[in-house]
Amino acid sequence: MKAILIPFLSLLIPLTPQSAFAQSEPELKLESVVIVSRHGVRAPTKATQLMQDVTPDAWPTWPVKLGWLTPRGGELIAYLGHYQRQRLVADGLLAKKGCPQSGQVAIIADVDERTRKTGEAFAAGLAPDCAITVHTQADTSSPDPLFNPLKTGVCQLDNANVTDAILSRAGGSIADFTGHRQTAFRELERVLNFPQSNLCLKREKQDESCSLTQALPSELKVSADNVSLTGAVSLASMLTEIFLLQQAQGMPEPGWGRITDSHQWNTLLSLHNAQFYLLQRTPEVARSRATPLLDLIKTALTPHPPQKQAYGVTLPTSVLFIAGHDTNLANLGGALELNWTLPGQPDNTPPGGELVFERWRRLSDNSQWIQVSLVFQTLQQMRDKTPLSLNTPPGEVKLTLAGCEERNAQGMCSLAGFTQIVNEARIPACSL
């Protein structure tokens, strides 16, 4: 763990009346916020021979190592931190000027370079020139079970149950799943110029059909610690995400200049979202993987005397920022039955996307209420590197906890109702 002191963005808090941006009902007071964020724009995590075999064109180079956060990705995250500071000032949670009080803001990050740097960039945007510690587990060379208890052996998947659940969501089989998405696969083949690829030309010489789904059959693989898909589905998810990362990185010709409108982006990223729908949002997977984060979120949102937790943070606190991965957002969505699509953003779990949990207190009776939302930069905001503020905000989608039995006039779920939903979603064997 280290304290950082980063002069990144000047903190300009406009003197805007609180009522313009805070809750319309003045009897509600914001008391605590938990933000679970995907890391920012990164380089691809791998460069495989298969990636080259499916296109005649060379893949562009990146300015950082595989899987690392790019400097531009850090800037985009800092913009989100800057926006959140303005919003939290408007809602009365943070002061307009100066650094947050000691312990008022806590940041936890997974051990990867891209997540640690995301925590630093968010801190730089939220509180420039302030020493804020980015906490990780002590051993940064090993996976952190907070973000994946399966990978670390805390708990195991039930192979038969998970297989049945995923195949049911797929429509009966993975072949059915790919069959219903041929339009999107054809669009990917067009962007790749797949007919001129080594893989396709080789198949044609052998009088074999040249399509991604036939050349690369997909198979579901379930083990005690992971679920995955092989073949065209897995490849398509990775490649379409890479195209989006190219666009967000500001590269001159994402997808070799062959992606030109929002319809094409939505069609391509539907393949990425579809894989996440199967592998990360299926409740039989999501509930296990999300349990440690659910426990942490519940602890952070529940009023109680301050207690020091793992990572050295004291909870509850005003703001808890957790820098993780797209899988974490999808797992939490699947476990809590939160569903969303993002206007202007084809990726349902985009770089820098934030699943935000807020606890509000009703002043008339001190009752506690939970609001959940998804805050995200649109693809155009990423492309243009648009600075964010209350006047130029990121996208935001308010989410509904389907199982909540008690709501207030603003649609928030009671803290008791939220706690019950979390307790029913979590898998005790996967707790830390």
Swiss-Prot record:
GO biological process, one term: cellular response to phosphate starvation
Disulfide bonds listed in the record: C99-C130, C155-C430, C200-C210, C404-C413
Result when mutating V41G: Retains less than 10% of wild-type activity with phytate as substrate
UniProt xrefs under CDD domains: HP_HAP_like (cd07061)
Residues that, per the record, bind 1D-myo-inositol hexakisphosphate: R38, R42, A43, P44, T45, K46, R114, R289, H325, D326, T327
Outcome after substituting G40A: Retains 50% of wild-type activity with phytate as substrate
Induction context: Induced by phosphate starvation, anaerobiosis and entry into stationary phase. Regulated by the HTH-type transcriptional regulator AppY. Negatively controlled by the cAMP-cAMP receptor (CAP) complex.
Active site: H39 (nucleophile), D326 (proton donor)
Description of pH dependence: Optimum pH is 4.5 for phytase activity. Optimum pH is 2.5 for acid phosphatase activity. Optimum pH is 2.5-3.0 for acid phosphatase activity.
Result after altering T45A: Retains 20% of wild-type activity with phytate as substrate
Impact upon substituting R38G: Loss of activity with phytate as substrate
PANTHER family xref list: 2-PHOSPHOXYLOSE PHOSPHATASE 1, ACID PHOSPHATASE-RELATED
Family per record: Belongs to the histidine acid phosphatase family.
UniProt protein name: Phytase AppA
Organism: Escherichia coli (strain K12)
